[in-house]
Amino acid sequence: MRRLKQIIKSFTLWELLKGLSLTLRYFYRKKVTIHYPDEEVPSSFRFRGMLALRRYPNGEERCIACKLCEAVCPACAITIEAGPREADGSRRTTLYDIDAFKCINCGFCEEACPVDAIVLTPEMHYSIKDRGENILTKEKLLMIGDRYEEQIARDRAKDKKYR
C-alpha cells in the first residue's frame, strides 16, 4: 500500500504541485520590492552619508582644530594641521583632509566634535571617478556643508531631544 502511494505521488508530481501552490499564494500578495533607481528608499534623518564641514551663520567656519575627530577616528581617515588665524590669533585648521576610501562612516567624528563642525550629511549617492578625488579637502567639505546646511539644521532640530 505504501509503495502504491509513492508511485501515485511520483506520477502526479505531488512535490511540484505543492511548490506551485506556494508560488501562486505569494504571486498575489502585496509586493515589497523597491525598484531602486526608479524608486527612492526612505531613509532616516539620522542617516550617515557623505561628510561635510559646517559654518556659523556669519560665514566663519566652525572647526577650532581641537583634533578630537582625528584622534577618535578608528580608520585614521582624518588628517588635521592647525595654525593661528591672522585676525585674532585663535587656532584654526590650515589642513583638513578626509580620505573617503578609509572612512567607514561610523559617525565617531561627529559625536566627538564639541562645536558640531563635522557632520554626516544625508547624501548617499556620490562616487569617486578620478584618482585623487578620494581626498576630501577642507574646501570641498565646506562646499558640501554649505549645500546641505538647511537640511542638516532641520535634522539636528529633530534629533535635539535625543542628543
UniProtKB/Swiss-Prot annotation:
All residue ranges annotated as the 4Fe-4S ferredoxin-type domain in the record: 53-83, 94-123
Binding site for [4Fe-4S] cluster 1: C63, C66, C69, C113
UniProt key word Translocase: yes
Recorded GO CC terms: plasma membrane; respiratory chain complex I
Keyword Cell cycle: no
Cofactor: [4Fe-4S] cluster
CC cofactor note: Binds 2 [4Fe-4S] clusters per subunit.
Localization, UniProt: Cell inner membrane
A Pfam family per the record: Fer4_7
SUPFAM superfamilies tied to this protein: alpha-helical ferredoxin
Known EC number: 7.1.1.-
Broad enzyme group: translocase
Membrane topology: Peripheral membrane protein
Keywords of this entry: 4Fe-4S, Cell inner membrane, Cell membrane, Iron, Iron-sulfur, Membrane, Metal-binding, NAD, Quinone, Repeat, Translocase, Ubiquinone
Residue numbers binding [4Fe-4S] cluster 2: C73, C103, C106, C109
Catalytic activity line of the entry: a quinone + NADH + 5 H(+)(in) = a quinol + NAD(+) + 4 H(+)(out)
UniProt GO molecular function: 4 iron, 4 sulfur cluster binding; iron ion binding; NADH:ubiquinone reductase (non-electrogenic) activity; quinone binding
NCBIfam families: NuoI, PRK05888.1-4, PRK05888.1-5
Family statement drawn from the similarity comment of this UniProt entry: Belongs to the complex I 23 kDa subunit family.
Quaternary structure and partners: NDH-1 is composed of 14 different subunits. Subunits NuoA, H, J, K, L, M, N constitute the membrane sector of the complex.
Protein function: NDH-1 shuttles electrons from NADH, via FMN and iron-sulfur (Fe-S) centers, to quinones in the respiratory chain. The immediate electron acceptor for the enzyme in this species is believed to be ubiquinone. Couples the redox reaction to proton translocation (for every two electrons transferred, four hydrogen ions are translocated across the cytoplasmic membrane), and thus conserves the redox energy in a proton gradient.
Name used for this protein in its record: NADH-quinone oxidoreductase subunit I
Organism of provenance: Coxiella burnetii (strain RSA 493 / Nine Mile phase I)
Lineage: Bacteria, Pseudomonadati, Pseudomonadota, Gammaproteobacteria, Legionellales
